[in-house]
Structures are given as structure tokens and as C-alpha cells.
Design a protein with these regions (language model features):
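Polar, S/T/G-rich
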Residues: 2-197
Length: 197
């Protein structure tokens, strides 16, 4: 056996040992490591609300979900996008960039309806959701989520389209920032203006 072969065998063994010792023993941490960098929406009403600057595709955090309608065929979702006021959802050729499991919402036709709230201080609770959940007691929705950008979405059940709650991501034109050159506030993807904010 040559010196190179012995050196390679020793280094491979050391690398394997270091990798084994540094890998997380907690299965939750292992899953967290595997999904790091992927856009997966969360479902946690205690999650921090992100600040979004410039143009970014981000997952929503579903903070409210309830079924209603005939035979509970409608799934109503409220997904927080970020702290407002944002400029809105980015459009290409007049189509909002909203994805459900990496497909544009338009591929689902009438099974999807939504309203985007940009996070103004005067926005009101979604009237369709308030009406759909009226009479549900503590589960009824009436929160306007002021100063929080969010999306209200209704998904109509179709077993050929949905195998579960879809992963929802949106392409957002982020927070409005002050342009110190003109003393105006508006959307900008200029990194210097975003950093100044």
C-alpha cells in the first residue's frame, strides 16, 4: 500500500468522524438543516413578522385556517407576508405572482380566490372571511391585522387538485422607503435606500 493510499484512508476516516460528531442528534434540528434555504410556509401565530425590502419571493406564515361553506368545501386561510406597508404583490403581464406548490395560482382557476392587504394602518378585516366565519364563536375572524401585510385566500376543495394545504409563496414589492434625494416615500429596490431605512 502506497503512502497516498494510507493518507487518503486516514483523511476519509477523520472526515467521517468529524461529520458524525457535528451532525445534530435532535431529529427536529436535522430536518431544520435539510430544509434550510427552502421556501416553506409556516403555520405559527407566534412567528416573528419579517421586514421585506426590494423585490423578494417569500413564503407566507399561515396564522388562521378554517373550513366553511357547503360540506366544508372551502378552506379559508390568512397568511402573513410581512410588516407593512408594502408596495404590493409583483405582477408580470397583469398577473400577481402568487404560487401554490410552485404553480401560479391561475393554474387552479376558480378553485382559488384571494385578497392582498398591504399593511396600511387603516385596513379593515376581510368582509368575505368575516361573513364565512360568522357564528363560529371564538373561531370567528374579525382582525384587520393593521400594519401587517397579509393575504386572505379561499381554496375550494377538489381532490384532483389538492392533496393537502399548499405551500404558498408570493413575490413581494417590499416596504416603502424614504428616498433622501427627493424626500418622498415609496417602493424601491435600491439597496442604499433600503439599508438607510
Amino acid at each position: 500500500m502506497g503512502v497516498e493510499t494510507i493518507f487518503f484512508a486516514v483523511m476519509s476516516s477523520l472526515f467521517s468522524l468529524v461529520q458524525m460528531l457535528s451532525s445534530p442528534s435532535d431529529p427536529l434540528k436535522a430536518l431544520e438543516e435539510q430544509t434550510k434555504g427552502q421556501m416553506i410556509d409556516s403555520k405559527d401565530n407566534q412567528e416573528n413578522i419579517p421586514l421585506i425590502y426590494g423585490l423578494q419571493r417569500v413564503p407566507v406564515n399561515i396564522v388562521y385556517m378554517v373550513t366553511a361553506g357547503d360540506s366544508n368545501n372551502d378552506l379559508h386561510l390568512v397568511g402573513v407576508i410581512g410588516e407593512g406597508e408594502i408596495n404590493g404583490i409583483h405582477q408580470v403581464d397583469g398577473v400577481d405572482h402568487i404560487w401554490l406548490n410552485d404553480k401560479l395560482y391561475t393554474e387552479y382557476g376558480s378553485l382559488v380566490s384571494y385578497t392582498v392587504y398591504t399593511g396600511t394602518s387603516t385596513q379593515t378585516a376581510n368582509a368575505d372571511l368575516v361573513a364565512a366565519t360568522a357564528g363560529m364563536g371564538l373561531d370567528a375572524w374579525n382582525d384587520p391585522l393593521r400594519n401587517t401585510a397579509y393575504i386572505y385566500m379561499r381554496l375550494r376543495y377538489d381532490r384532483d387538485k389538492w392533496q393537502g394545504v399548499p405551500n404558498i409563496t408570493v413575490e413581494v414589492e417590499g416596504l416603502k422607503v424614504l428616498d433622501t434625494r427627493t424626500s418622498t416615500t415609496g417602493y424601491s429596490a435600491n439597496p442604499a435606500l433600503c439599508a438607510y431605512d
